[in-house]
Amino acid sequence: INDNLMQQAETLYRYLFIKNASPKWRTGSMAELVSVRYGKDHKKLADGTIPVYGSGGVMRFVERPLYEHESVLIPRKGSLNNIIYVNQPFWSVDTMFYTEMKLCNVAKYVYFYLKSQNLAAMNVGSAVPSMTTELLNSLQIKIPSNSTLMMFESIVDPMFKTISHNQIEIKKLMQVRDYLLKKLFS
């Protein structure tokens, strides 16, 4: 179900912003839509309930967030194409950028835009794949009308909320399964 919802949201993104992009939309830079921020070291934080994201996904849970708002996480080192959308308090490690939105209703647009880019091909590292804020900030992106962004948000936000709810339910069901299996085999 979650994959299907994400595919629907991505299809809508392509339909609205690629196939039917308005010629009136100007081309701008990513820096006009988001501020790209560096993640920070997490090793001195105590365990808690806040997810810590690295380029491979959630690494652990800590006591406090680095950022508490909607964000798009972009790998700085490693798996450069593993773009992550987050809409809950989180911590981002120092090998992962996070973004602060400068405009309303742009996070999911930016998420799908970045997923459509081959960031791995923009690698500036030698031994380890690497990304820079300068490169991300300079990415050329169409700046859609506010009404188009609002319409997109109103359609895909419920999809993202359903995905989030489903992920919580899956985690609970896995815990029940593990408990029951443990009882069955003990």
Annotate each PLM feature.
Residues 1-54, 142, 146-186:
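Non-catalytic DNA-recognition/assembly elements of restriction-modification systems
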Residues 26-144:
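DNA target-recognition domains and sequence-specific DNA-contacting regions of bacterial/archaeal
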